[in-house]
Amino acid sequence: MAPEQFGNPAARELGYCPCCGYLTLSEAQPGSYEVCPVCHWMDDPIQFSDVEYVSDTNHVSLQAARENFETVGAASEAVVEDTREPDEPRDPNWPY
């Protein structure tokens, strides 16, 4: 299955983080509310389906969080200290 423009449900079901693309979450449907230890993104079901939505949970949209991860290594500058370097595999279809 090719990645979709605004998220890849198949990749998320395998445990890949929708923000950074690393295999850090449990195998589940999008919206498990788990926090990725690599980028500190909370897996929010609304933001997974609407990447421009800014929630009270993550305080940035999924699209902005992906851009932030590429520049600062975290979903937002406010959570950089809560992240770590990845040692998990990354989704080969990354970026979404």
Predicted stretch roles:
Residues C17-C20, C36-C39:
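Short cysteine-rich clusters marking metal-coordination/redox-active sites
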Residues V35, I46-F48:
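Compact nucleic-acid interaction/catalytic patches
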Residues S26-E27, D44-I46:
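Short, non-ligating residues that shape and space the ligands of small metal-coordination modules
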Residues M1-P9, V51-Y96:
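Short, intrinsically disordered terminal segments enriched in charged and Pro/Gly residues
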Residues L14, Y33:
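Residues immediately within or flanking Cys/His clusters that coordinate Zn2+
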